[in-house]
A protein has these predicted regions:
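Alpha/beta-hydrolase fold catalytic core
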Residues: 1-60, 84-86, 125-126
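Conserved alpha/beta-hydrolase catalytic His-Asp/Glu region
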Residues: 31, 168-169, 189-252
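Active-site loop/oxyanion-hole signature of alpha/beta-hydrolase fold enzymes
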Residues: 45-47, 53-55, 90-131, 135, ...
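Conserved HGGG/HGGXW glycine-rich cap/lid loop of the alpha/beta-hydrolase fold
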Residues: 48, 54-98
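Catalytic His-Asp charge-relay segment
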Residues: 60, 254-256
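Short, conserved loop/helix-junction motifs that constitute active-site signature segments
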Residues: 80-83, 250-254
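Conserved hydrolase catalytic core segment
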Residues: 122, 126-169
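A catalytic-pocket lid/entrance helix-loop region that shapes and gates access to the active site
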Residues: 157-160, 164-191
Length: 256
């Protein structure tokens, strides 16, 4: 009986800790959204709400952010600089920032490209130049392959474009797992200290220094919301297979 009792105690404690973590995660998420509310506007694409910022006049440029980020990465300085000569639009990708998720299975780069392409049409943008950073460049590449008639040029910065050797980090493996992720993500969202998030942001720029004010602008707490953690992990988990499938079609690219 004693082993059964101990097992019951452990299960009860685990369930209580998991429930408490969900409550605390909700509080932290509301605080993050209050501190970093939507900075742009929304466009409806079918049943999906897409968050975007537009600034400037001239030929259209679309900016797509990378993993663990949102459009604030682009509005820190790049949007203002490009807006001197272009009409610049930056989007939140699905599940990141304030754009809705398309579904719970992890949006592919092609699905994300289709959503953002439809959003540009809804906004009246004309054959934009696409600039994607890191993972966002993979989305831009999928966009140019799938919808070449909607793109005038393609700019990829540090973006995965071909299959690579190597696996995922342990964190991505856990968070993308249907069971382990459901257990781990509430604890991460509830208890990961802000100092850890700050340190991760700083390491992105190694060996250079982080630009002054960048961490205060981008809204890093938005990235540890439960929906963002799950979406981010699923996006990363599927990327290699999606790039491998896309690569044979690069000879069809018709943009510069």
């Amino acid at each position: 009986m004693k082993p059964l009792m101990w097992a019951a105690y452990v299960l009860a404690f685990g369930a209580a800790a998991w429930g408490l973590s969900h409550l605390r995660a909700g509080l932290r998420e509301r605080a993050a959204e209050a501190a970093f509310p939507p900075s742009g506007q929304f466009v409806q694409v079918s049943t999906t709400r897409v968050h975007y910022v537009t600034k400037g006049e001239g030929p259209d440029v679309v900016l797509i952010h990378g993993m663990s980020g949102n459009l604030r990465d682009m509005t820190f300085s790049l949007v203002d600089r490009l807006a001197q000569d272009f009409r610049v639009t930056a989007f939140d990708r699905p599940g990141m920032g304030y754009t809705d998720r398309l579904h719970d299975a992890g949006e592919t780069i092609v699905e994300q490209a289709a959503l953002l392409s439809a959003a540009t049409r809804a906004l009246g943008l004309e054959k934009p130049i696409l600039m994607g950073q890191s993972y966002g460049g993979s989305v831009a590449l999928a966009w140019a392959v799938e919808f070449p008639e909607t793109v005038s040029a393609l700019v990829l910065t540090a973006s995965p474009s071909h299959p690579w050797d190597g696996g995922m980090s342990r964190l991505y493996k856990v968070n993308s797992h249907p069971i382990l992720g459901a257990l781990a993500i509430p604890f991460e969202a509830a208890w990961v200290p802000s100092s850890y998030v700050q340190g991760v942001v700083e390491t992105v720029f190694d060996p250079q220094d982080m630009p002054p004010g960048y961490d205060r602008h981008i809204g890093a707490p938005l990235t540890i919301r439960r929906t963002a953690l799950k979406a981010n992990a699923l996006h990363r988990a599927g990327l290699l297979d999606q790039i491998t499938e896309l690569e044979p079609r690069y000879d069809k690219l018709s943009v510069m």
